[in-house]
């Protein structure tokens, strides 16, 4: 009888741990998704107004369509896990908007190897990386900026590479960011440079 009691207690404890881990993951994902910058929405809508006022209705339509599709995937009915194809489509809409806002200072290429679009990923995992690439590199480009996204297989894993030809970061900054023991200063800013 005591063995059954112990097994039952262990099952309850394991269930509690699994539930707590799921709640933790859900909270972390909510924080990530809340980082969709509201300024992005405001600035995009301001751009649409400006385009419309200046008779550039075709461009305004392209931007609004991309924005609607961007948010359709962002909100995707509460699902936090989406196919890689949807994540890449989300990135495509984000880049369409940003290329228009930044007056085509950069080009973007999105490529997926065969068979990598159907596995699932955490939603909105690429967009913050693109945001960093644009704000810290492409904003200063002179029409020669390039951002490349490649979804590829590496054994059983799917890797999504995001590269750009921006100025990058000094090697010592990269090493410090990757060092788990490095002291962290709270700068109040989001993202890496």
Tell me the role of every PLM-derived stretch.
Residues 1-36, 40-192:
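Two-component histidine phosphotransfer core
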């Amino acid at each position: 009888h005591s063995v059954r009691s112990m097994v039952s207690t262990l099952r309850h404890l394991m269930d509690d741990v699994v539930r707590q881990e799921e709640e933790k993951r859900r909270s972390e994902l909510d924080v990530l998704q809340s980082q969709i910058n509201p300024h992005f929405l405001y600035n995009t809508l301001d751009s649409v107004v400006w385009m419309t006022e200046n008779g550039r209705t075709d461009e305004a339509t392209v931007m609004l369509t991309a924005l609607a599709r961007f948010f359709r995937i962002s909100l995707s009915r509460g699902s936090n896990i989406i196919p890689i194809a949807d994540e890449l489509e989300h990135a495509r809409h984000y880049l369409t908007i940003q290329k228009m806002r930044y007056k085509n200072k950069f080009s973007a290429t999105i490529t997926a190897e065969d068979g990598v679009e159907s596995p699932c990923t955490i939603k909105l995992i690429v967009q913050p990386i693109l945001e960093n690439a644009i704000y810290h590199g492409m904003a200063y480009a002179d029409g020669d900026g390039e951002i490349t996204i490649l979804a590829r297989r590496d054994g059983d894993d799917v890797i999504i590479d995001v590269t750009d030809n921006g100025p990058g970061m000094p090697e010592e900054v990269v090493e410090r960011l990757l060092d788990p023991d490095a002291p962290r200063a709270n700068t109040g800013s989001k993202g890496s440079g």
